Each structure stands twice: as C-alpha cells, then as structure tokens.
C-alpha cells in the first residue's frame, strides 16, 4: 500500500510529496499528473488571485519514465508568492483558517504566510500523489466513481417506492 508525506509551506520555495511503497514498473505520465493539477487550479478570479504553474518535478524514484521501487519524490515550486500580503495578519489569526491552531502547535514558531503548512496550496502535492495512485489503480483495472445526489430527492423516491409497495 502506498504511503505518502506532504511537505513544504504555501510561501516557502516549494511544496511536494514523498511516496513510499510505490511498486516498481509503474509508468509515470507527467502530462497526466499536470492535467490532474489543472483540475484543482482556480477556475474563477474570485477564488484566489494566486496562479501557480504547478509544473511537477520528479526528483527520485523514477527512471526512464517508470518507478524503480524506491520512494518517489514529486516537487512543485512556488512561484506566485506575495508574502507581504500577510504581514498585517502575523499576530491576528484569521477566522475559519488554521492560523491559531498552527500557532499553538508550533509554540508560536509557525510560518503565517499564506497559511504556511495549512494552506490550500498543500492540496497540489495531494493531487499529484493521487494522480500516481490513479495510474496504478487503472493498471489493476480498478475504477473509482462518485456522484453528488440530492438527498431530499432520494428520500422522496424512497418514500414513493414504499407507498407503491
């Protein structure tokens, strides 16, 4: 079973993921990983002003486009960083963010810029790891599907079915 550790901070040099127990011989399609990363990119100007290119760099565990069985390290450099935007928030935790929790956990030594290690930016390495896992699942002929349903409509259909007997 693959195991992963994400690393980096929102306004540090990079974020990334280290995957262990990746089977040897798994083809690594960097274009597929990039396409998956594009799906998590902001889709409208109101969500965030930050726009990262999200180009994945394979640092280890892959040779000639195939995993070697050693840990796979994927890196995404942070390029669109404006840390000064967070100067005023250094001593003021934002509501609905992990700022205060990070401050308590680190004894006040947390990186407050952009949420640090608790930023949405850390979803990028999770998506990269997921793309690699998805490639492995496909080779095993395992498909994962999901859908969003209207719970009220589902309850109504169930009630109608009960009434019909």
State what each model feature region is.
Residues 1-165:
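Generic N-terminal targeting/processing segments that precede catalytic cores or assembly contacts
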């Amino acid at each position: 079973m693959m195991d992963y550790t994400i690393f980096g901070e929102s306004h540090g040099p990079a974020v990334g993921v280290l995957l262990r127990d990746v089977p040897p011989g798994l083809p690594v399609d960097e274009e597929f990983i990039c396409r998956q990363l594009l799906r998590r990119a902001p889709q409208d100007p109101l969500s965030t002003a930050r726009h990262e290119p999200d180009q994945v760099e394979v640092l280890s565990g892959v040779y000639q486009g195939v995993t070697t069985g050693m840990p796979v390290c994927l890196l995404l450099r942070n390029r669109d960083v404006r840390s000064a935007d967070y100067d005023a928030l250094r001593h003021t935790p934002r509501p609905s963010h992990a700022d205060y929790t990070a401050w308590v956990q680190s004894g006040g030594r947390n990186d407050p810029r952009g949420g640090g290690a608790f930023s949405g930016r850390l979803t990028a390495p999770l998506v990269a790891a997921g793309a690699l896992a998805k490639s492995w699942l496909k080779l095993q002929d395992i498909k994962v599907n999901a859908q969003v349903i209207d719970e009220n409509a589902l309850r109504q259909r169930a009630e109608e079915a009960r009434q019909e007997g």
